[in-house]
Amino acid sequence: KEKYPTRFYNIGICEQSMMSLSAGLALAGLIPVIHSITPFVTERCFEQIKDDFCYQGVGGNIVSVGSCFDYAGLGCTHHCYSDIAAIKSLPRTQIIYPASEIEFDLLMKQTYNNNRLTYFRLPQKKHSYKFSQDQIKFGKGIKINEGKDITIVAAGPQLENVLKAKTELEKEGISPEVIYIHTIKPLDKDLIIASAKKTGIVLTIEEHNIIGGLADEVARTLEDMEGVRLSRLGVNDRFITDYGTYDEICNSIGLTPEGIIS
C-alpha cells in the first residue's frame, strides 16, 4: 500500500465483489492478490471463485488469515475448517498451507504467476522448525527424519506438536517418520507412498475437518495399497462450539502432543 499505492484497493466488507473485481483484473492480464479472513474469502466467495476464476481459467492468489479456529473466541462465523475441502474441489486450483515466513515467501515467489488460482492458507500460529531454502519446493513434501514404525503426515503449525510427540515416542522405543506437507494440492504422493510402504501405518495431523482435507488426500493416495493402516487426527466432522483460546480448543479435540501419542 505504501510502496505501490496505485496497486492497492480496499474494497471493504464486500468480499464477493472483491473476488469478482480481482477476476476482472486477471482477465485484463494482471496478477491479483486477494486478502481477507479465511471464512470470508473462501466460503462466502465460493461461487465467485468457481465462476469468475476457475471456470474462466485465469490465475490469481488468495491469501487468507485466521484459518480453522485461529479466531477462536469469535465463534462459528469466524471459524473455518472446511476451506481446503471447498477450494480443493475446484479445477485449476492449488493449495498451499505454509506455517513459517520462509515457506510463504518462497512458495509465493514460486507460484504467484503460474496461471493457476493459488490459495494460501496462513495460520496465526507457526512452527519453530527451521527449513533451508532448498528444502522448500512447491508440490514437494519434506521428510523431517527417517523412521520405521509409523509415518506421521503433518500440515501447518501442528508440526510443532508432532515433533514434541516424536521425541516422547522415541523414548518409548517407537520410531516415527515425520513428513511435513505445505502443498496440499498437488500433494506429494510419491513421498507418502514410499514412507507408507516402509512403516505400514500412517497418521495424518491437521487443523481442518478430517473430511476433505489432508486426511482425505492421503487416504486417496493410499487406497490401492494393501496392508497400510490410516488414522486421522483433526476436526472430526463437527462444529467447534467450545469457547476458549486457540490452545484450549486444540486441547479439547486432541491436537496436542499427548493426543498424537494416544
Regions found by a protein language model. Give the residues of each.
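Thiamine diphosphate
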Residues: 1-262
